[in-house]
């Protein structure tokens, strides 16, 4: 059994607007059994050419009630309220009923595995009935300004709990996670850090809408299923040795290394290939990633403490709950990590107070509002340097209780290397992925020790901070 989870802004679950063209064929269910006459030998132009007109007599085809058939919309039918599917059930049904594999057979997905469908921050919502779902709370599409919504950190906690619950079912062999192609790399990396499992987690995307010309989602899903059932990931017989992966365009990439670089099929780079998914050969691994993940991650859910220390906004600290009695992430634990992007030729010095890119203001805000917070500096590639004003303010941020990770800009290939105290070196992670790992570290280690005077910490305060930063550095070096 493969669990299929519909996540936010998933293009793979999106469709063109219905009713835009009255002649457009849309998969619909037949209301009753139907017998129709088709022209003989009209399924292929060569057959039409080779057969005489007398051999093109009508042939009767019988279609059953409830069968999906591509037909024009009935007269007067209006556009659908939402273009996204609320889950992947209908998508899988259409792919199996209306599409064929290269051998001309339908039911490609159904022949490979059985499926159970779930929703975790899905792209469409059920807005009727006694408990209508709410845009931006229960579901997250993209599109026109008034009809799009982005999930927040609370939604990420909900997603994490849901996926952990799903993989815990004994009959689930693996998970397909469906999300929007520009952002799946962040969520997938997070799931690979937090989810405690030996089962594969496969990210699935599409660059083009389902039902549209050149739609790529169907083949990506088939390749993802083939990867799961191949057991190629189970190298030592102990479970997944690869970690969360993105399967798209016939390539299996690690969640940590994959990046979207273009808005088209083939628009991902990095992360492999761990394996390739050619249709004619079995899937096998090309290399095994060495970073810790899932069942071996130092920040997986089972390794997180029940409580961690957070700042209280009054110069002291308090304990905040990370997990409830059942081991699920507590809904009220909402860490915050801001990305500071450095570019040369900014304003240096002066009385405007903007030379540090707003870091001091962000620190003041975090002290008042967020007990668990941190920063990622996206500095010069690959070493993460910025201006002295920015670095000085970020140093004070660390001694205020907010750890700071240095990263190179863009999609760095070389690691940051050794950073000056009191910063964490972000290895070769992008700023967005370093942010996800720092969020996980805040859940594992809590806030950094805060100095009485963050601009002038004592030797003892420096040692306490260094010990804390060392714990984070070990995680960043291995995950």
What are these regions (language model features)?
Residues 1-479:
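Active-site histidine-anchored catalytic micro-motif
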